Each structure stands twice: as C-alpha cells, then as structure tokens.
Amino acid sequence: MTGVNPATGKNPAPGNGPAAEGGPDQTPSPAKDTGPDEDTASDEDTASAQGLDARLVVDRGDFHLDVTLSVAPGDVVALLGPNGAGKTTALRSLAGLTPLSRGGRLRLDGVALDRTPPESRPVGVVFQDYLLFPHLTALDNVAFGPRCQGVPKAEARAQAADWLDRMGLADHAGAKPRRLSGGQAQRVALARALAIRPRLLLLDEPLAALDARTRLDVRAGLRRHLAEFEAVAVLVTHDPLDAMVLADRLVVVEHGRVVQEGSPSDIARHPRTDYIAQLVGLNLYRGTAEGHTVRLDTGPAITTTEELSGPVFVAFPPGAVTLYRDRPTGSSARNLWRCEVAGLETHGDQIRVDLTGELPLAADLTTVAAAELGLHTGAPVWATVKATQTHAYPA
C-alpha cells in the first residue's frame, strides 16, 4: 500500500490501505476483494516467480508506452530517459494510478495485479515532491501507512518511531513538514513508504528537489537503505549519477520503449543511442567495420584498435580529442579531421568545445589550452584522436 495525496487535508483514519502518493485526492477506503485475475498463477508458479514481471503498455493519445520489466527481489532498477520518454507513466502504471492498456500485464511475486486498485497493492511510493501530510508530524506521517493497514495506533507509532530512528530523524519525530529541510522531508517520505513493508518500492526522482550538497548526503543514505531492502525497487531518474550510484541495473527508455538495458558499467561503456552517449559523456558514431577501420554511416573513417567486421558503434570521450589551429605534423594519432568551432561552454573545470566539419564531435580542453589556441565560434581547427583512445563494439 502507498500513501495518499495529502491535498485534501482530511485526517487519516484506519483502513485496509492508502492510495498511492501523488494519486487522486481521496481518503483511504477499504480495499475491495477483487479476487485473482483469470490468469493468476498457480501456487507452484507463484513460488518460483518471486519479484516483478511486467509489461507496461499504456496508450494515451499519440503516446504509446511499451516497457517490459523483470526484477528480482533485492534488486534496484533505474528507469532512465529524457523528459517525455515515459518513465513517470511507467511508474504510475506500476502503482496502479495509470491503468494498463490491452497487452499489458503486471505480476508481483507471482500474483497478478493488473486489476488491483492502488490502495490494495503492496506498493510503497516516494514521489518527487514527497507529498507529506502538512498537518501531521513526521511520526504520524510515517505511522499513517501501518494505521491504514489496521495496525493499532500505539503499535503503528512505535513502528514509525523505529523507522525515523533508522533514518536518523528520531529528534524530528514531532516536527511538521514545514519545519523539515528538504533532505529530512525526503527521508520521512522514504520511511513512510517503507513502513508498510512493501513488496515493490517506487521512487520518482527522489533527489531532484534537493540542492547539490543535500543531494550528496541523501544519496549516500538512500543507497544504504536500498541495499538493505529485500523486495523490488524501481527508481525513475534523469540524473545519470543517481542511476549509476543507486541502481543494480539500468533500463533506458526513449519514446516509450526500452532502447538499452544492462549494468551501469556496461551502459557507460557501450552506449547505443545519442542520448545515452551524451549522458555518459562520450562521442558516439555508427558505421561498418573492416578490420581496424570503421567507415561511418555519415562521415569519415575512424581507426580503432579492435579488429571487427560488420555494423559497429565507435565511441571516445571528449577528453581524448586534441585540437590544433594548424595541421599537426609528427603526431602519432591515427585519426585526423578538419573541423570548425561551433560553440564553447564551461563544463566543470574545463571548456567543452562543440565542433562541426568532417566529423561533428565534442572536445574537452583546459581553460589555458583553450586560451592558447585562441578558440572562438567559427575558428578552424584540426582534431586528432589516437586509435588507442577509441572503443568499437558490435551494433
């Protein structure tokens, strides 16, 4: 069960389970016994089907979502993608706030939840803005879920106190949300979601509302709590660092479909779309390999150290690019292209140079190097990359 949207301002009352946080404005209502779906798994199937097995199909106007997820208990999966890719729609369909369309399915620990209302699902949700009840203390916010499950008030408050203690918030149990910092509010929201002992934990951009310093501390704590969580966790984010640090596996969604999935290291090492390449900071190209030479689909050839054949991707980091104002002589780099500066911007402690020309690419230079080269928009340059700094892999 999840927590309800506090926008109604109504006092919580015991019941069978709350609606999902961020869902329709409603007070908890008793869960209906909808019975199993016709295709509910047998006991034997259920015993061997622990975790999440879902195909999330949602048709909404011109947008079509079709995402398949399979997650084992104890694993954390991050849904990563640009704005409008369908990440939040997928999360809401898992919570039951957005109904699945024809062809969709949702099983949790072998039990079909397709037709189960949100308040009856064993799901905890933490949304981006947390949605804590403003009129309740931190303690009562966390106790709300257990109370709606029928736990006696004293026991529910004791459980809530234990969760707040685990979150390092024991001293803030009596504080109302307006007295909490962003990081404290995030931890209260997480405690509220975990207090109902969910079999599926959903987190929608859980760190997005925090400043950089607070995010650093809260991210470390969230990683610890997720490592201790024994059920399934699904995290939605557009921040690659959050995804890399918090998740065991990444599922990248673009235009409503999965374009790549794998471990964080595999995704970072082998991006397969421009979005992912930009996310992990790589120049990415597609072409056809003939030995150590890759002839790009659009552009020149690139020399690599890998010996491959057929369709491939080639990637290299912006830091692997060396720029010259004049054509270099005596360089050991096997790749040389004539380019033009399209733009410059500060990128951390370096200057990111966007280049057009024979090969569009990004290059990272120190501020001193950029000044010595006298770079400006429209300046002609030569770009070189050593073959040893490229990475080619099958498409």
Language-model features: where?
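ABC nucleotide-binding domain signature
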Residues: 78, 114-117, 122-131, 143, ...
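ABC ATPase nucleotide-binding domains
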Residues: 122, 137-272
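The feature captures the beta-strand-to-loop junction immediately N-terminal to the Walker
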Residues: 80-82
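Conserved ABC transporter NBD signature motif
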Residues: 102-111
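ABC ATPase nucleotide-binding domain helices that frame the ATP-binding cleft
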Residues: 88-91, 188
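Glycine/charge-rich catalytic "coupling/switch" loops of P-loop NTPases
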Residues: 298-345, 367-395
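Helix-to-loop junction immediately C-terminal to a conserved catalytic motif
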Residues: 95
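Pre-Walker A (P-loop) beta-loop-beta motif of ABC nucleotide-binding domains
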Residues: 67-78
